[in-house]
Curated annotation (Swiss-Prot):
GO terms for molecular function: structural constituent of ribosome. InterPro entries: Ribosomal_bL19, Ribosomal_bL19_CS, Ribosomal_bL19_sf, Translation_prot_SH3-like_sf. Belongs to the bacterial ribosomal protein bL19 family. GO terms for cellular component: cytosolic large ribosomal subunit. This protein is located at the 30S-50S ribosomal subunit interface and may play a role in the structure and function of the aminoacyl-tRNA binding site. It comes from Chlamydia pneumoniae (Chlamydophila pneumoniae). NCBIfam families: rplS_bact. Keywords: Ribonucleoprotein, Ribosomal protein. GO terms for biological process: translation. HAMAP family: Ribosomal_bL19 (MF_00402). This is Large ribosomal subunit protein bL19. It comes from the Bacteria.
């Protein structure tokens, strides 16, 4: 029974998503329908947290625009997500970057990671 549930969940998960980690800056494009029309909206931000697993996995993105910090959460396996593009890799020592919430400007920056990403999780 448990194996059957895992198989069903694997079928619903997307395989076209790139591998990204907390601290990376990504550009996430989502489909939005307004007034009967559909358009694509792009949100670029730093990955603050990845929660859950399987079909219910979510990602929280943080971005500073016009001096105000914004935070948005997205379901990774949602059919509304059109594409995910990695802009730059970040070098962090935390699994959750909630300390970015109160920061603006240079304090909200994450150091860029240069080098190969390890395959360990």
């Amino acid at each position: 029974m448990v194996n059957l549930l895992k198989e069903l969940e694997q079928e619903q998960c997307r395989n076209d998503l790139p591998e990204f980690h907390v601290g990376d800056t990504i550009r996430l494009a989502t489909k939005i329908s307004e007034g009967g029309k559909e358009r694509v909206q792009v949100f670029q931000g730093t990955v603050m947290a990845r929660r859950g697993g399987g079909s219910g996995e979510t990602v929280s993105l943080h971005r500073v625009a016009y001096g105000e910090g914004m935070e948005k959460s997205f379901l990774l396996n949602s059919p509304r997500i059109v594409s995910i593009e990695i802009v730059k890799r970040g070098k962090v020592a935390r699994a959750r970057l909630y300390y970015l919430r109160g920061k603006t400007g240079k304090a909200a920056k994450v150091k860029e990671f240069v080098g190969p990403r390890s395959s360990k999780k």
